[in-house]
Amino acid sequence: MENFFALIIGVGGDLAATAEDATAIKNLLCDPNKGGYLPENIAFLVNDDSTKKNVIDSLENIISKTKKLDKATVLVYYSGHGLQIPNDADPEKTEYFLKTSGADKLKKEETMLNGALFSEKIKQIKADKLLILLDCCHADGMKYKNISELEGMMIEEKPSNRGLLEKLDSGEGRVFISACDDNEESVILPGSKNSLFTEVCLEVFDGKLSPNDEFVSVVDLMYYVIKEVPKRVLPFHHIQRPIISEVHHLSPDYFVCRNGNYKPVQKDLEDFLINNSAERIDFIKNYNNKI
């Protein structure tokens, strides 16, 4: 797992649950008995550490490391808030931002991460497998959480999940997943510690779907996220449909992390195992909320 890298961001502040989500992801991935990532290969930025500068520095560090490798897997997880903001010079044009620690309404370029810059850095990552998870537009306990640092902005703020994903270059080995669409919210269900999107991701990373597989595949992740998130919010009369990128040549051998609950099957029973990869890939292909 020495060629597996991760950048995990939880903005925190008024969105305290985002730091908890990021911490849960980090703890599972770097656990040697679970995700198996080397601690030195994980950049972990939460609360005051999740500044724009630290995010950019961490991305550039990953860019530098992956340039030297033939094959690498990179996971970028962001839990916070995305914004769609009219351009200062031309209000007809829209800019996309990810909130970072210290966001200042008067200095958005200096204190928030512009989607174009984020996309540029992501493009520079030379990894044959790249997974971007965006858990934006949080609602705590089924209620929307305000961001006090951004209150009073004399601009129209809109969620930016779809716009941000559209800026990212898709392609073979590149998978982008956002927790919800622009007119929706990423919720924390009553009694849950983490957002529903992150909770479902954690279940997959922990091997819930494929206990007989040594590694967790991105096919399992995409399948479970787009299947479970919309289903689990229905009893609360809520709609939440994750957005995924269109992925060509999606391979069941695209692994995200080690399966901490791996239970090897006896040799004499291996021929009786059911491989669900083809069925899950078809389910993903037929999902209609894509970029």
Task: Map each language-model feature to its residues.
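Cysteine endopeptidase catalytic domains of the caspase/legumain-like
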Residues: 1-290
